[in-house]
Amino acid sequence: MYPNKNSQQTFAEIMLVSVTLFWGATFPIVKEAIELLPVMAFLWIRFALAALLLGFMAGRRGFATLDYRGWCNGILLGTLLFLSYLFQTFGLEQTSSANAGFLTGLNVVWVPLLAGPLLKKPAAFGAKVGVIIAFSGLILLTWHTPWTLNPGDLLVLACSFFVALHILGLDRFTAGYDARALTFVQIFTMAVLGCIGSLIFEPVSWPREWPLSLVSAFLITAILATAYAFWAMTRFQRLTTPTRAALIYTLEPVWAAIFSVWLLDERLSSLAWAGGGLIVSGMIFAEAWPLLRRRSSGVEPDLKMN
């Protein structure tokens, strides 16, 4: 299908870009949906629909690639994903979808910092500078008088940490397994955890009417932002590096802000836009630093290098 490794990696990275588009678009969609349905109820229904689709796509042949370790890997990855969505969706109740998009994108700074202790790859100078730049942006984005962090912002910040763990986990635990089957295990795990949490913590009162906006939210988030997105991540992220993948994911908050302004008519102050720009700049600096360093030393960069 691909003439060489570079074109294979390029195609994989284009697929990951499409993932960020669908994720960014769902921020305003989910924000409206959780006004009609409790958070965990919305999550488990979304994930259950996506799991049904993925299970059908994987088929018997796909599940045959999963051994005991494969199932355990999928459950672990699914648990990390569930925690990220839980913190993000609760955070959306208390902050703007644009803020949530930018803050979720901070996972790209966590990745190189966590890669040191978890994958024995210490953080580079660029990652440390990126953290400083992004943290400055965080202060501007969430600035109030007097300055405080919105509780919703803190929840989404926790979400970004678990997203980073999931990115690192995909790099380590997915090789050798059918992407659709392994993604099914992840999403099914999320559906089960969400259902249990909803039954325990949420007195669900189902809407008397299911408006088109809620039905559309389920279909869009289940099919495009869950089934397709995590299949694409599981299938294609291993064809690039965690660092390059994390850099691509910096597009998510940009899409989130664009769709939030377009669909919800949200308005960000110039200070907030500047903060969001600094966050994205910090993300890009952290991930582009190795490439810039190799070029300045006259070494031809290898796309597959960290």
Predicted regions and their residues:
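Helix-helix packing/entry segments at the starts of transmembrane helices
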Residues: 43-45, 86, 100-106, 170-192, ...
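Hydrophobic transmembrane alpha-helices of multi-pass small-molecule transport proteins
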Residues: 54, 75, 123-143, 159-163, ...
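Specific transmembrane alpha-helical segments of multi-pass solute transporters/efflux pumps
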Residues: 22, 26-27, 55-104, 140, ...
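Hydrophobic/small/kink-forming positions within alpha-helical transmembrane segments
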Residues: 21-24, 28, 55, 78, ...
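C-terminal-most transmembrane helix of multi-pass membrane proteins
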Residues: 2-5, 47, 214-216, 250-306
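Hydrophobic alpha-helical transmembrane segments of multi-pass integral membrane proteins
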Residues: 10-15, 41-56, 76, 126-133, ...
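C-terminal transmembrane-helix exit sites in multi-pass transporters
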Residues: 53-62, 107-129, 254-274
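Glycine-/small-residue-enriched transmembrane alpha-helix faces in small-molecule transporters
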Residues: 1-41, 79, 87, 145-172, ...
